[in-house]
Swiss-Prot record:
Gene source species: Drosophila yakuba (Fruit fly)
EC number: 2.3.2.-
Tagged with keyword Transferase: yes
Assigned GO CC terms: endoplasmic reticulum membrane
Role this protein plays: E3 UFM1-protein ligase that mediates ufmylation of target proteins.
Ranges where the record places region Disordered: 405-480
Similarity comment: Belongs to the UFL1 family.
GO molecular function, one term: UFM1 ligase activity
Coiled-coil intervals, chain numbering: none
Keyword entries, A-Z: Transferase, Ubl conjugation pathway
Identification of the protein by name: E3 UFM1-protein ligase 1 homolog
Length: 784
């Protein structure tokens, strides 16, 4: 056997021995491995974390090591979302392990879903230090924006933790979120000190900061350390820096001006750059007292030693004082007047002793002596007014005006309320209607047009009727009568001008006269009253004649109105007669009752009397008047003839006569009445009153008679005149009448009322034209 064979035998023996010594290796299939792991998991003998695709799993400890590896690989800052994507593990598992890592390791922080270790914090601390050295100042808000980290984390765990170590700087005491270097503070101090040293006039702090590039908060914090030669007005946005040299110049100018003039002008102080002049004056002169006016401030010494002293002397000598001679020439007339008013408003002053006019102060005794000649003027004017009858005429007109201006509230009493209730009952029962399908138009009554000097008084028929004056061509309520002017301003001017010219004050003659015109006019009126009362017989005769004329005018009116109302049916006639007597008849009773009261020396407070008041007054009169007055009051509820007979009896008792009737003037009076109605119609804008006026005009045109009727008779008048109008005219008036009723019955702000008013406005011109242009010829043509 050769050597080669022996070597082969040794090799085979070695392989066999190796096979004997090696244990048998058993291989498991993948399925067996899965079953084994599942069993271990079920028995909680093993804990693993599956990947998102479920094909792999890993133990939590190994996953924790891989998360730490990712933190290291990313430079000490790892986003858990990115780690979850990289490791292919659910984010919730990553977050749980990240919290455990941060809890177990103090050098690792979990911040807003990110793991950050101390190495990264040291790195950004170095970056912050480099930036701070470069800029000199940084804020936490800037760092939070740069590093995308919470500001609290940056402040406490990064900046403050490494402040003085890695970060070379200091924290702002006023704002802990700001950090700066000492070199930056020194540069800011140098800039501020240099800028303030160069300023010589007040300048806005914002302008300074803009020029030197320093933040406002640092400026105010370093200002006290710098101790500049000036002061900042405030720490607000609009604050100013005022150099001491400028403030000293201001103070020197103000002190010098006040020392020379004893007053200070606000405008002059404001031109120095001082906004609140009054406060500055108080601060600059703490021991001085000032009189602060609208435009200037006067020193108390100037006021007391000059003005007050001069006023006292003026009062004692009974002269006048020109304030412009004792006050500084810089003061305007408004300033001087304000000085005088302020002094007069003080406790120790008596403004009644002086009169101020155009910078001149007059003492009352001086003016009294100046206008003394006007007393004789008032006496002579009063005598002339009484002798010429001017004052007597004024008394008559004043009495009539007072009657017409008595308010409705003063006229109401219990008896009148009862009558109103009675009228409401009649209206609700339908007795007041008639004509135009029984419609009743509740409108304002037209004016009572009467002839003569007197004006008619207010109607009292309907509470909704608006009663107006009978004279004046459509004028409204009577205005307050002006007092008789016996002494005029021009008269006083003539008397005092000569005296004022001697003093060079003639330009004040008219203002002084205006002050005393009313006083002397009242004196003249009082004297005229004395002279008038001294001649009672003359006064009585004139009053007697005036009332006699008015009563005759009333009776003529009633006669003309009676002709018109007789054209209506009996039932309507009765209502029209009642209305006529309640209005014009009531006025006649009032006139005669007041005259008799005056003859019997009885005092009557209310000149517009009702029936009960007239009965009471008649019972207090003398026997010769009593029976006739009582009978006249009763006749108001009877016929017109009975009322006229009763009135004649009263007139006879009063020694008055009834003028003879002149029927030739009837046509002229009727034409005058119609003309006044037409004038009122042209001025009227209220639909109900416009319809009322139109039908009265048409009635007068058609019948040749006048009618005294309130608004509730409109429907009856329309029914009466419809036969004289064509179909189109009747339709127009009837449509307008229906719309007026619709407006009166609807709520003022309702849509129905607005639509009706629009239609009325559109039809107004046609109704006015019909009333104004309708003529008797049209009536005759219609009849044909």
């Amino acid at each position: 056997m050769g050597s080669g064979d022996w070597d082969e035998i040794k090799r085979l023996a070695a392989d066999f021995q190796k096979a004997q010594l090696t244990s048998t290796l058993q291989k498991l299939s993948e399925r067996n491995c899965v079953e084994i792991v599942t069993l271990l998991l079920e028995k909680q003998m093993l804990e693993v974390v599956f990947t998102n695709d479920g094909k792999e799993y890993i133990t939590p400890d190994h996953l924790e090591r891989e998360i730490q590896d990712e933190l290291y690989v990313n430079g000490g800052r790892a986003n858990l979302v990115e780690v979850s994507k990289t490791l292919n593990v659910d984010l919730s598992r990553i977050e749980v392990l990240a919290e455990r890592i941060a809890a177990e390791n103090p050098s690792v922080h979990l911040v807003l879903g990110q793991l950050i270790d101390e190495d990264y914090i040291s790195h950004i601390a170095q970056e912050i230090n480099e930036k701070l050295v470069l800029r000199g100042e940084i804020s936490i808000s800037e760092l939070a924006s740069q590093f995308d980290l919470p500001s609290d984390f940056l402040q406490h765990d990064v900046v403050e933790k490494h402040l003085g170590k890695i970060i070379k700087g200091r924290q702002d005491a006023s704002n802990p979120r700001v950090f700066f270097t000492q070199a930056y503070i020194q540069r800011c101090k140098a800039k501020i000190r240099g800028a303030l040293a160069a300023i010589t006039r007040p300048i806005n702090v914002a302008v300074i900061l803009q020029q030197i590039g320093v933040q406002e908060k640092i400026f105010h914090s370093l200002l006290d350390e710098i101790a500049p030669a000036g002061q900042v007005t405030s720490k607000l946005a609009n604050s100013q820096y005022v150099p001491l040299i400028y403030a000293k110049t201001q103070a020197d100018w103000v002190n010098s001006f006040y020392k020379q003039n004893s007053f200070l002008e606000y405008d002059a102080i404001q031109k120095l750059g001082i906004s609140d002049a009054k406060s500055y004056i108080r601060k600059q002169f703490p021991n001085e007292e000032f009189l602060f006016l609208k435009r200037v401030a006067l020193g108390a010494r100037l006021v007391e030693l000059t003005v007050v002293t001069a006023l006292n002397e003026c009062s004692a000598t009974k002269q006048y004082l020109d304030l412009t001679t004792i006050l500084p020439s810089n003061l305007s007339e408004e300033d001087i007047e304000e000085v005088f008013s302020t002094i007069m408003g003080q406790k120790h002053s008596n403004p009644n002793n002086f009169v101020y006019l155009d910078s001149i102060v007059f003492s009352q005794p001086y003016l009294a002596q100046l206008v003394q000649p006007c007393q004789a003027l008032a006496e002579s004017q009063a005598k002339a007014a009484v002798d010429g009858g001017v004052y007597q005429q004024y008394i008559v007109e004043k009495t009539l005006a007072q009657k017409g201006s008595v308010s409705t509230q003063e006229l109401e009493d219990d008896g009148k309320v009862d009558k109103r209730d009675e009228r409401r009952k009649k209206a609700s029962s339908g007795k007041a209607g008639g004509g135009a399908q029984g419609r009743e138009t509740k409108t304002k009554s037209t004016k009572k047009h009467q002839r003569g000097k007197a004006a008619a008084h207010n109607d009292s028929d309907d509470e909704d009727d608006v009663q107006q004056s009978s004279r004046g061509g459509g004028a409204g309520n009577k205005k307050a009568m002006k007092p008789l002017e016996l002494v005029k301003t021009a008269d006083i001017v003539k008397l005092i001008t000569a005296s004022l010219e001697e003093e060079g004050l003639e330009h004040l003659a008219k203002p002084i006269s205006a002050l005393y015109t009313n006083q002397f006019n009242q004196t003249a009126l009082a004297r005229a009253q004395e002279l008038f009362e001294a001649t009672p017989q003359t006064n009585r005769r004139q009053t007697h004649a005036a009332i006699q004329d008015r009563i005759n005018t009333f009776l003529i009116d009633i006669r003309l109105y009676e002709k018109g109302l007789k054209l209506f049916p009996l039932e309507t006639q009765t209502q029209l007669v009642k209305y006529l007597l309640k209005s014009l008849g009531n006025d006649i009773c009032n006139e005669l009752s007041l005259y008799v009261a005056g003859e019997c020396n009885l005092t009557v407070k209310n000149t517009n009397l009702n029936v009960d008041q007239r009965i009471k007054l008649a019972q207090e009169c003398e026997v010769q008047y009593r029976a006739s007055l009582l009978e006249q009051n009763k006749a108001l509820n009877k016929t017109i003839d009975e009322f006229e007979l009763a009135t004649e009896t009263v007139l006879k008792a009063c020694s008055m006569i009834i003028k003879k009737v002149d029927k030739k003037k009837d046509r002229l009076l009727i034409a005058d009445h119609k003309k006044k109605l037409q004038n009122q119609l042209l001025e009227c804008q209220e639909p109900a009153l416009l319809l009322h006026l139109a039908v009265l005009i048409l009635f007068t045109t058609i019948t040749g008679s006048i009618l005294h009727a309130s608004g509730k008779f409109v429907s009856a008048i329309l029914q009466h005149i419809r036969g004289s109008l064509n179909d189109e005219q009747n339709a127009l008036l009837l449509r307008y009448h229906d719309l007026v009723l619709q407006v009166l019955q609807a709520t003022p702000d309702s849509s129905e009322s607005k639509v009706a008013n629009e239609h009325l406005q559109a039809m107004q011109v046609q109704v006015v034209e019909l009333a104004q242009n309708f003529s008797r010829a049209s009536v005759f043509k219609a009849d044909c």
